Structure formats: structure tokens, C-alpha cells
């Protein structure tokens, strides 16, 4: 075996996969058996720990920033007389806070743990087989603990009561709230699947559309449900506020159903093998355009071929006009 082959083998043995896609990696010299996929090696435990730390730090950073911004936005005296009211300025501020917070948090920790930062997103990734079920459970625990920690930290660091907890408003019923949470989460999870899981040249920019989708979800839902779309966010805020409404379950069931709905749409596209047909259609269109040569119009060709004759005739006419004009 050459030295290069030896170095490659050493690199394979020490390879870690913090995103969880390659949890069950088996060294080449060990034949795979039915027991290997259930075996937990030291490197696998280390990978899970790295992912747990990444998800905790990313979720904490995201939710702490969002909670504080939401608290500032909701400390408006205009809401004292109308607690169910909603001001466009406040909605935009809250939406920007959550959208930009999740955007930079994903960019920071996507390379460490995948940057799900949301149990509903983690479920979609698990259903899409982007992460293993074990990694999904690890991410869930880290995200939920981070949500409670972020809620406690935001509550302790800011004066006044906690105003970032989720609650129904504008007369929204529990059933409507459930479906709003489901569809809002489905938009977010589908954005993750289509921009981060699908292999594209723009994968490195996935945090941008994900942040925009969360921004849009907050603009649409905040007045009605307070915009959960993230069980860790809803639980952390409820713990900080010590307020668990009897309909708190909609902030869990709704996002999880939305996660499954998003995966169903994504899975349908995979069954249809849309990438193959879209690529073939684009290639055919490009080939057709290349085969079409741009030809000048017929009048232009005639003028070009008869230019000397036309020049002689026009010159003769001009001279005749001049001669007759003098006469």
C-alpha cells in the first residue's frame, strides 16, 4: 500500500459527520452486518454530542434574540387598552426579529449540527432521511432545553412582564389556530427541504429563504396565534411567562402536522422525479434555441443585394430633380 493510500485510510477512520447523515459509517475493513447499524461507536457518540451542542447554541441564540425583540415590540402602551389589538409596526418588528435571528443562527451552526433549530424542522429532515431518527431525538432534546433556557434568560435580562408568549388573538378559535400553525410551519419546513436538502448550487444560501419564510409566517400569523411554528419557541416562552393556556397543545400538534404536510409535498415531488424532467426540459429548450439561427428579414437581404442598383437610380432621380428644378 502506498503512503497516499495509507493517508486516505487514516482520514477515513477519523472522519466525523456533525450533520448526522453518515452516523452509521463503518471502516472499510469491517464487513457490514445487520448489527452494525445498531452499534454506537465512540465517534458516533461524539458526533451526537457535537450536534447537540450546535443545536443548543443555535436555538438559544435564535430564540433569545427573537424573544427580546418581541418583548420590546409588545411593550406598547397602545396595547394596554386593547390587548387583542395588533399594530402593523409591531408585527413587522417581531417578524424581522424572528426572521433575521433564525437566518444568522442557521448560517453560524449549519456546518456544526445542520441548523434545524426547530423540532418541526427536525422531524421533516428525519422523514426525508436527511438525519437519522437517533439524531432527530438528540436535536429535539437540545432544541427544547435551549428554548426554555432562552426564555428564562430573556425574562431575567429584560424588565417588566413576559410579552413574548404565544396566545390566540382577534377572536381566533382553537381550530383556526391549529390550522394556521400547521400551514405556517408547512411553509417553513418546505422551504428548508427545497433549499437545504435538495442538491443545488445555491445550498449555501439556504439560510436566506428560510429566514424570509419565517418572516412571512410571522407577518401572517402573529395577530391570530402569536406565531409558534416551533414547539421549542412556544414551550420556552410559556415556561418563562408561567402561562400555559388550555389550548397550548395547538402549538405542538399544529407544527408537527405542518412538518408532515411539508414532507408529503416534497416526497410527492421526489416520486415524480421532477429534477430529471425539469433538467431535460431545460436542456431541450437550450438546444432548440441554439439551433435557431438569427436571420435578417427578407427586405433587408433584398436591399443588401440590390444596393448598387438602388444607389444608381436614386442618384439619377436626384440629378433629374436638380436639372428640372433649374429649368
Curated annotation (Swiss-Prot):
GO cellular component, one term: endoplasmic reticulum membrane
Annotated InterPro entries: Aquaporin-like (IPR023271), Aquaporin_transptr (IPR034294), MIP (IPR000425), MIP_CS (IPR022357)
PROSITE patterns: MIP
Domain of life: Eukaryota
GO molecular function: water channel activity
Motif, NPA 2: chain positions: 230-232
Membrane topology according to the record: Multi-pass membrane protein
Keywords: Cell membrane, Endoplasmic reticulum, Membrane, Repeat, Transmembrane, Transmembrane helix, Transport
Record motif NPA 1, residues: 118-120
UniProt topological domain (Cytoplasmic) ranges: 1-48, 113-136, 198-203, 270-327
Extracellular side of membrane: 70-91, 158-176, 225-248
Gene3D superfamilies linked to this entry: Glycerol uptake facilitator protein
Region (Disordered): 1-34
Entry's transmembrane regions: 49-69, 92-112, 137-157, 177-197, 204-224, 249-269
Localization: Endoplasmic reticulum membrane; Cell membrane
Chain's role: Water channel required to facilitate the transport of water across membranes. Involved in sporulation, freeze tolerance and osmotolerance. Is non-functional in most laboratory strains.
Entry text on domains: Aquaporins contain two tandem repeats each containing three membrane-spanning domains and a pore-forming loop with the signature motif Asn-Pro-Ala (NPA).
Family in the record: Belongs to the MIP/aquaporin (TC 1.A.8) family.
The name this protein goes by in its record: Aquaporin-1
Source species: Saccharomyces cerevisiae (Baker's yeast)
Amino acid at each position: 500500500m502506498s503512503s497516499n493510500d495509507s493517508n486516505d485510510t487514516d482520514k477515513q477512520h477519523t472522519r466525523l459527520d456533525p450533520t448526522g447523515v453518515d452516523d452509521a459509517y463503518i471502516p472499510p475493513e469491517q464487513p457490514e452486518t445487520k448489527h452494525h447499524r445498531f452499534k454506537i461507536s465512540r465517534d458516533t457518540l461524539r458526533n451526537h454530542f457535537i450536534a447537540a451542542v450546535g443545536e443548543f447554541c443555535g436555538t438559544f441564540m435564535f430564540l433569545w434574540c427573537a424573544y427580546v425583540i418581541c418583548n420590546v415590540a409588545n411593550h406598547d402602551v397602545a396595547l394596554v387598552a386593547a390587548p387583542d389589538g395588533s399594530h402593523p409596526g409591531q408585527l413587522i418588528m417581531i417578524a424581522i426579529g424572528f426572521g433575521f435571528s433564525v437566518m444568522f443562527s442557521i448560517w453560524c451552526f449549519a456546518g456544526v449540527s445542520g441548523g434545524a433549530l426547530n423540532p418541526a424542522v427536525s422531524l421533516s429532515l428525519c422523514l426525508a432521511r436527511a438525519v437519522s431518527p437517533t439524531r432527530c431525538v438528540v436535536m429535539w432534546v437540545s432544541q427544547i432545553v435551549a428554548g426554555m433556557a432562552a426564555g428564562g434568560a430573556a425574562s431575567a435580562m429584560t424588565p417588566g412582564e413576559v410579552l413574548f408568549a404565544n396566545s390566540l388573538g382577534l377572536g381566533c378559535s382553537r381550530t383556526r389556530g391549529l390550522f394556521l400553525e400547521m400551514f405556517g410551519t408547512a411553509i417553513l419546513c418546505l422551504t428548508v427541504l427545497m433549499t437545504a436538502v435538495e442538491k443545488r448550487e445555491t445550498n449555501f444560501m439556504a439560510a436566506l429563504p428560510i429566514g424570509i419564510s419565517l418572516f412571512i409566517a410571522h407577518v401572517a400569523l402573529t395577530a391570530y396565534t402569536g406565531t409558534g411554528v416551533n414547539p421549542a419557541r412556544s414551550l420556552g416562552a410559556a415556561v418563562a411567562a408561567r402561562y400555559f393556556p388550555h389550548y397550548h397543545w395547538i402549538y405542538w400538534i399544529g407544527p408537527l402536522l405542518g412538518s408532515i404536510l411539508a414532507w408529503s409535498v416534497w416526497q410527492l415531488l421526489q416520486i415524480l422525479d421532477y429534477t430529471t424532467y425539469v433538467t431535460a426540459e431545460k436542456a431541450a429548450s437550450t438546444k432548440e434555441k441554439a439551433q435557431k439561427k438569427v436571420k435578417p428579414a427578407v427586405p433587408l437581404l433584398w436591399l443588401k443585394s440590390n444596393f448598387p442598383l438602388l444607389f444608381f437610380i436614386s442618384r439619377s432621380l436626384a440629378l433629374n430633380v436638380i436639372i428640372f428644378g433649374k429649368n
